[in-house]
Amino acid sequence: RSRGLGDVYKRQVRTMSKIVANAEDGGKVPPLTHVPRTKRGVVSYSARDIAERLNAKAIVAFTTSGDTAKRVARLHSHLPLLAFTPNPAVRSQLALTWGAETFLSPHVKSTDDMMEAIDDALLEMDKYEEGDMIVVIAGTPPGIAGNTNMIQCHLLGETKK
């Protein structure tokens, strides 16, 4: 059976109408409401919980593959999510992640190097100052994708002392 052109246009208008309605509603995806049961999921959930309870200025995800930042993003915290990655392609992907601000970082070999890279980037911004509390979620040792296993409460500027 062939469809007339009118049917195609009606379907296109209905689709555009749904898109507009969703955009006007804020285009919000509901947050993840259940407690995850995987190691990386629980670590991400805990980092968000700790950051909110401590009134941290931000949650920082140091990520190789982007997965850590995406896991935190889907929890929809009211805190800024700052995603650091040494991979330009991952940074481009994360630019499309809900609520994430992305940073290209150097490759780091240790947690101390990671904290120093975070301090250097954030203290250059007007939004953050020395002594601000952030919560960092990452994998240790750094650089291994899928190894999210660390949460650290960090005061900006601590690496300079």
Place the predicted regions along the sequence by residue:
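Phosphate-interacting basic helix/loop segments used at nucleotide- and nucleic-acid interfaces
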Residues: 42-56, 115-126, 132
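Nucleotide-binding motor/catalytic cores of P-loop/tubulin-like NTPases across gene-expression machines
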Residues: 68-70, 76-114
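Beta-strand/loop-dominated core regions that host nucleotide or nucleotide-derived cofactor-binding catalytic loops
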Residues: 101-104, 120-121, 148-161
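C-terminal binding/interaction regions
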Residues: 129-142, 148-154
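Structural signal for hydrophobic packing residues in well-ordered secondary-structure cores
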Residues: 17-27, 51, 76, 80, ...
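Single conserved hydrophobic/aromatic residue that forms the stacking wall/gate
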Residues: 1-9
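C-terminal accessory/binding modules appended to enzymatic or scaffolding proteins
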Residues: 46-74
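Long, charged amphipathic helices and adjacent flexible linkers at domain junctions
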Residues: 14-48
